[in-house]
Structure formats: structure tokens, C-alpha cells
């Protein structure tokens, strides 16, 4: 029997850099409350959100991803010619086809490289990061861009008091490649499809096209169900990720959970028994929930402010629509 040849690549893979793009428009809680019976204090107390960013009409998930990738490449001291592939993780690339990744690669000037989109709700960044690391270790690529990008603002029903204050827009990218020491641990991922309706688009686009004068599609959220699932299940996911990476909770310097709700993340910190001085990302306060972009955006913010530094040992946990989750231990990159 003829054997099929295989390839292998770098054994030690890590994050070389991160780059963030935040839209200019800042939307306050007071502006959100013009459409609902609520207040800045009520929203902040329950979510930890004070402001968020909304993209301009001429901005898209792909255009924001491109800018984030440019900044990540610059921070790594690389050019588009040094990249072998792009993975875009998003829930808001509003074209069924073509995928966003080849468009982003072309905009960067990276011709002929591999590119694909990955959709796993708010856990998408963890899935994409794991895929990139495995591709590099398998020899399919040497250096890759992974970018989380979302334009969620058009999907929000601004009169839905249950979630109109949560979601926001933005993008952040990391460069993944060979490092002197292991910089990305195994990905622990899974899903609970029995709770798929907990975060959902309520009307599909085909149904809407058949009745364009009817209700339009929006994202709907069953907040209490998601809160319970995340607060009480994701602690175990984090422990499994640490076990897989061979590290203890007291060795974690930085905790970067999905920026869905600061109250959920406060419970996770207690559940995980991290060190009292461990840095906990709280980018949600001025960024909102940017779904697949939230973890890399939060990483960028920690590095920009100096709250974390390159090389710090970080636990990442993404969770959301699906319901899906993905977690891994990484070394923080350059900002």
C-alpha cells in the first residue's frame, strides 16, 4: 500500500502580537436608554457596561478585521508577505458568500494564501486560535493571522430591553507563529446545542425576504439562562484548560474571559481560585460585548494600559451562542 506523506511544523507556537481596531463612535448608556425604560445605573450594575462602540455605516466586519490585522502585523514587525493564512472568526459577515478571510487577505496584500471563516458564536476566537496553532504544528502554515471581528449594532433591536445595551462593534487580531517556548496550550472546547435558542437570531433571512414588510431579524438573548450556564459551567472549562496545559490556578497571571457580563466574570474568578493579584480583563466597561472579538480586544487593552505584559501566563475562556465554549492557556503577546 502506498503511504500518504504527512507534514510537521514548529512544535512551540505562540502569539507574536495583537492589534485592535475600535470604531470611533462611542455610545453611552444614556443614549441607549432613549429607547427603553432603563438607566445608566441599572445597566452598569447588572452588566458592568458604561459605554460601547458602534461602527460607521461604511464599515463592515471585513473592513474592521483588515485594520486590526494591519496593526497586529505592525506590532509583530511583519508584513503581509510573511503570512501564510488568515482565519476570520465572526458572526456578522453579512454575506453568505464569499467568506471574509480571502477579502481580508487581499486587502492586506497577502496574495494566494489560505483563508477561511469560522463561526462559533462568542467562543469563535478560541476555536480559531486552536485551529491556527494546530495548522502551524502540523506544517500547513508557519505564520497566521487570527482575527475576531463583529458589527453587531445592526443586529440589535434597540427597543428590546433584554439585550439592546449589551452588544457592540470592533475587531482585534493576533499573529500566531513559532516561538522559543510553548505559547499556546491545548484548546478545550465543546457545546450544548440543547440550549441553542438561548442566544439566537429570531428570524432567518429567507423568511424575512419572503415577507419584507414583516418583522426583521434581530439577535435575541435569554439572559438568565446564559448567565446560569456561563457562571456555573465555565469554571470547569477553565480548570480543564489549565490541566491540559499543565499549569495551576496560582500560576495564572492574567484572566481574559469573554466580555459578556462583568458579573459573570467576577463569579468565574472566585470559582477558578486564581491568585488575588491575578489581573482580570474588564474591557467590557467601555467596549461592550463584541462577541468573537472580545477576547483579543481585551488582551490588547490590558497590554496598552500596562495592566499585563508580554510573556504573562493567561487563561482565555470564550463562551456564548451555540451554546459553545473554548478555552486555552497562552503567553501574552506584544501589544
Curated annotation (Swiss-Prot):
One of its GO terms (biological process) is long-chain fatty-acyl-CoA metabolic process. It is found in: Cytoplasm. Changing residue 161 to A: Retains 69% of wild-type activity. Loss of activity. It catalyses: malonyl-[ACP] + dodecanoyl-CoA + H(+) = 3-oxotetradecanoyl-[ACP] + CO2 + CoA; hexanoyl-CoA + malonyl-[ACP] + H(+) = 3-oxooctanoyl-[ACP] + CO2 + CoA; octanoyl-CoA + malonyl-[ACP] + H(+) = 3-oxodecanoyl-[ACP] + CO2 + CoA; decanoyl-CoA + malonyl-[ACP] + H(+) = 3-oxododecanoyl-[ACP] + CO2 + CoA. Its EC number is 2.3.1.301. CDD domains: KAS_III. Phosphorylated on Thr-45 in vivo. In vitro, can be phosphorylated by multiple Ser/Thr protein kinases (STPKs), particularly by PknF and PknA, and to a lesser extent by PknD, PknE and PknH. Phosphorylation decreases enzymatic activity. Phosphorylation may fine tune the interactions of mtFabH with the components of the FAS-II system. Dodecanoyl-CoA binds at residues 38, 122, 289, 319, 321. Phosphorylation on Thr-45 decreases activity. Sensitive to thiolactomycin and resistant to cerulenin in vitro. Inhibited by decylSSCoA, which modify both of the active site cysteines through disulfide linkage to the decylthio-group. This is Mycobacterial beta-ketoacyl-[acyl-carrier-protein] synthase III. It comes from Mycobacterium tuberculosis (strain ATCC 25618 / H37Rv).
Amino acid at each position: 500500500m502506498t503511504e500518504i506523506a504527512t507534514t510537521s511544523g514548529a512544535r512551540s507556537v505562540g502569539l507574536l502580537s495583537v492589534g485592535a481596531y475600535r470604531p470611533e463612535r462611542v455610545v453611552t448608556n444614556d443614549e441607549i436608554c432613549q429607547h427603553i425604560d432603563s438607566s445608566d445605573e441599572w445597566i452598569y450594575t447588572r452588566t458592568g457596561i458604561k459605554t460601547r462602540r458602534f461602527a460607521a455605516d461604511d464599515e463592515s466586519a471585513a473592513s474592521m478585521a483588515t485594520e486590526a490585522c494591519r496593526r497586529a502585523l505592525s506590532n509583530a514587525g511583519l508584513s503581509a508577505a510573511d503570512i501564510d493564512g488568515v482565519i476570520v472568526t465572526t458572526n456578522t459577515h453579512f454575506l453568505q458568500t464569499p467568506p471574509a478571510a480571502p477579502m481580508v487577505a487581499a486587502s492586506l496584500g497577502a496574495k494566494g494564501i489560505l483563508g477561511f471563516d469560522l463561526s462559533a458564536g462568542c467562543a469563535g476566537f478560541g476555536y480559531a486560535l486552536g485551529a491556527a496553532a494546530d495548522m502551524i504544528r502540523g506544517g500547513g502554515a508557519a505564520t497566521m493571522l487570527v482575527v475576531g471581528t463583529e458589527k453587531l449594532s445592526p443586529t440589535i433591536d434597540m427597543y428590546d430591553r433584554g439585550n439592546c445595551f449589551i452588544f457592540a462593534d470592533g475587531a482585534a487580531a493576533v499573529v500566531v507563529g513559532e516561538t522559543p517556548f510553548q505559547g499556546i496550550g491545548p484548546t478545550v472546547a465543546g457545546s450544548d446545542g440543547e440550549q441553542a435558542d438561548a442566544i439566537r437570531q429570531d428570524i432567518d433571512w429567507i423568511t424575512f425576504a419572503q415577507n419584507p414588510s414583516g418583522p426583521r431579524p434581530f439577535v435575541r438573548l435569554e439572559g438568565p439562562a446564559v448567565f446560569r450556564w456561563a457562571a456555573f459551567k465555565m469554571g470547569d472549562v477553565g480548570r480543564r484548560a489549565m490541566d491540559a496545559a499543565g499549569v495551576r490556578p496560582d500560576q495564572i497571571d492574567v484572566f481574559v474571559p469573554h466580555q459578556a457580563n462583568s458579573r459573570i466574570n467576577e463569579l468565574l474568578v472566585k470559582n477558578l481560585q486564581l491568585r488575588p493579584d491575578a489581573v482580570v480583563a474588564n474591557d467590557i466597561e467601555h467596549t461592550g460585548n463584541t462577541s468573537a472579538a472580545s477576547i483579543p480586544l481585551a488582551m490588547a487593552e490590558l497590554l496598552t494600559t500596562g495592566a499585563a505584559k508580554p510573556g504573562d501566563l493567561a487563561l482565555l475562556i470564550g463562551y456564548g451562542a451555540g451554546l459553545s465554549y473554548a478555552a486555552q492557556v497562552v503567553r501574552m503577546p506584544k501589544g
